[in-house]
Amino acid sequence: MLRKLFSVLTLMAVLIPAIAQPQRGGRPMVSSASPIVNADNTVTFNLDAPHAKSVIISAQFAPKAEMQKREDGIWTITLGPVKPDIYPYCFEVDGIAVQDPQNPDWFPNEGFKNSMVDVRGAEPMDHAVKSVPHGKVDYVNYWSETLGLHGNALVYTPPTYDKNVNEKYPVFYLISGTTDTEEVYFKVGKMNLILDNLIAEGKAKEMIIVLPYGNPAKYTSEVRNTIEFGDLFGKDLLNDLMPYVEANYRTIEDRDYRAIGGFSRGGNQGLSFGLTNLDKFSYLCSYSSFTSMTLPDVYDNAKKTNKQINLFWLGCGTDDFLYGNAKDYAEFLDRKGIRNVQEYTTGMFGHTWMNARYFLSQTFPLLFNKEASEAAMSKTTAVKKPKKSNEPLPAPYVPTSERNNQRLTPELMAALFPPGVVSPKYHADGSATFSVHAPNAQKVELEGQMFEGLKPMEKGERGVWSITIKPDQPDIYPYSFIIDGTKIADPNNVEIFPNEGYKASLADFKAPEPDHQDLQKVPHGKVSYTWYTSKAVGFDRPVCIYTPAGYDPADSKKYPVLYLIHGMTDTYETWFKVGKVNNILDNLIAKGLAEPMIVVMPYANPYPEMILRGQATMYNPMDTQLTTKEFTESVVPFIEENYNVLTDADNRAIAGFSLGGRQTLACGLGNPDMFHYVCAFAPAIFGPEISANFENGTYAPATEINEKMNLVWLSCGTSDFLYQSSLQLEKNFQERGIEHKTMYPGGGHTWMNCRDYITAVAQLLFK
């Protein structure tokens, strides 16, 4: 296996230079890359599926189309040209929906998760990553008494939030649609980038944006079974999330500084909750939605309602299947004399996130700006006298939804949201049942890291295949379904493994007692997503940052920093989403076993964006010079300029897994004046390279390492294909007299081991 990995890495370094110069907006022009956005805005899709009988491309910007199979087993098609925007798509392989395994970008969802293609065009769009000051997006866990468990939400804070520590900000509660998760307005709606750009242009006020999960009943089956539904979302929002936000963020606690809105079901929830809580909200936004026309004490007193609302904004596409309902609702408001703003789009493919992003760009400039919102309300809406409740409508009037049949019906709901499958379903005995709907399949198998080989599944009612598994050891395991030879992630599991390539699902088997990686009832830190300007590559890049419970940018307390690097094909999200480093640190800190620290998780692979921009024609995973330059000259200075951190080497650590371990050794051992803790987890470093790195200056001399390092750590599983390589590295350290610690547990090249590595190392850092 060691020889195999070395061969793979070397082969990539040799072959990838043959990639042609990338086209504008596209990925590298290699035969199987996908998607490729060509110079004329056509898009080429490729899928390696040599055994498939049929492959169809299903993209939001075009009708479904049959792909053509080449002699090498690659299925291909070129569509377009396409109007610049971000579009979801997937492949249908012999009738089974499949993500694009070459595309790192996916659409978070409770159901099937499409891939996304970004057609950028010649000019940056409203949602583009521009070189402007960026806000942060925090992933937070709050205790919900309503639900009896921890809820999830995302919170955007504007660029000046951490600097202007005496400033308070207005808040916009922004809710996504049916089957969407709390991440969608961030990862698909790009709300943070749209607002960053508008703020930089002076077109919008700075504000906090809160993204709740619109379907809290789905958190666990126990919640569905034990809580009386009612307005579960509204109760959680009012009684739990809003108090959490106002206790943990500097908000202006006044109705004139609160807005609520959303897309699709989220628009319905936002309007319904906002209109029945006008003592708390004065800005209401509905994107591709509508709500009840019978809300008490709202519509029949137009004068009072109008006085309470600063902005009532309604937007919908004329080709949206909800256009009829949305138009009916807007006309109802007009008849009732309720002031509102209406905007209708065409050519954005209906009920889509292209519309949702556009609507944000139109409403952000109006929020918390009474002059602008009043101008919009006055210009767009003619205030009409309310009709008496018993006065009939004019004879010619026919509701829009009846005229054009664009309305929500039980039949349409059933077609859009067929009966779901719960998978995985966890049981009290520690097992879980995995299920997938595949009525036409001949053979379905389960593949997972919790067992060897493949497990055959059994077909049951409605064409649902199932199997129940109990692993030997409770843990978090990646898994997939193999349907007639086609591998797919579990379409009913929201938990997915972030990766530049194929993305497996994640199954979390809990032990009877909470483990170090579990979310426990302790003080929680936050994981924030933000952007920094890279001097090494010349454009803005993403980074994840964990700050411990109690961290306050307004406080004078400073913290040590761990720079934590992911492995090959992983992303900057993997240590958070799979490694669970935030939960591990929360629990260790709460028990007094680890020092409170900040953890920085950079994206260690700049090549995809460099190739896209024409700055590179190859990806060289073996090279560590670029990543070392990136970490030392861009990431570390950004953190030390923007966070309350200790800036001496005794308070800096660097660690990484696999390829990230290789990069950690080069950056850490090569810069002993910057890092005094260097920890490599199953590093992708090979025998001949170790001595060469000491001789060519990649690593500092052994005497200097011993003199300056507080900890050099090496760990690897005894079944890991890099185990022998790690033993060679340890032997080299011993021969050079480098003091170090080791950890060699059982297990392979897995994130189960990674979680154990970081748990052990975190207890040794900064002590």
Residue spans for each PLM region:
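Non-catalytic cap/lid and distal C-terminal segments of serine-dependent acyl enzymes
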Residues: 21-25, 31-32, 37-65, 69-416, ...
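Bacterial Sec-dependent N-terminal signal peptides
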Residues: 1-24
